[in-house]
Amino acid sequence: VYQLIIDQVEYSGTGSILKLIEDRKKELSLLGLFDDDKKKKLPKYPKSIGVLTSSSGSVIHDIIHRISERFPVTQIKVFPISVQGKNSHIEIIDFLDLIENYDSKDFLKPDLIIFARGGGSLEELMPFNEPDLIKRVFKLKIPNISAIGHDTDYTLLDYVSDLRAPTPTAAAEIAVPDKNYLLNQIQDLQVKLNQSIEQKYLSIEQLLLRFKNSVNYFSNSI
């Protein structure tokens, strides 16, 4: 007969990381960093977008292609970051300081920021769970979208950002309107405007005709 007595159970591996993230989430939530009423509204027609992501890989190409295809008048500025590693969150914070004080004759200061990276392991996504980064993003005056990993991946950055996108490509689609949709809207408005003008013209024409008939009637009566 064997007897197993357990005095203490500790998380290890992935379990310990998940517990760390959950503890941080609770602590930051109590500070109000994830409150919905603190979220900033995204610009409807952004003039310039700053994208914080790796300078290599498919993510940045997908974002640039999608934004340029949907709304080509928007400027795109890529701020290349290390999307994983022990100090990558510090690098991101430094770039955020740079963006908020951005001054260039060639590029407008971003009025929208996208954080993006492709999928990865829990360990690889940890920079986006660092409290210092979360607190810095909370203080950002520029509206921002989080697009980290795949649809099933969640980081603390997703909770503090003004909006979470399930994928980087989805972030690009959320960030800007579709020019074809806008053109169709303009064409519809043009048709309605022309119809309204035509109806007004016909109404005035009918009014003048009635007035003319009334004048003729009184003239004949006299």
Regions found by a protein language model. Give the residues of each.
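OB-fold/S1-family single-stranded nucleic acid-binding modules
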Residues: 2-19
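Structured core elements
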Residues: 5, 50, 114, 145-147
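A short beta-strand motif that forms part of the nucleic acid-binding face
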Residues: 6-8, 67, 160
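Flexible, glycine/proline-enriched loop segments at strand-loop-helix junctions
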Residues: 11-15, 48-54, 79-86, 123-124, ...
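Phosphate-binding glycine-rich loops and their immediate beta-loop-alpha structural context
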Residues: 20-124, 129-132, 138-140
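Small-residue-rich beta-alpha loop regions that form the catalytic core of phosphotransfer
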Residues: 116-117, 121-180
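Charged, elongated alpha-helical interaction scaffolds
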Residues: 151-222
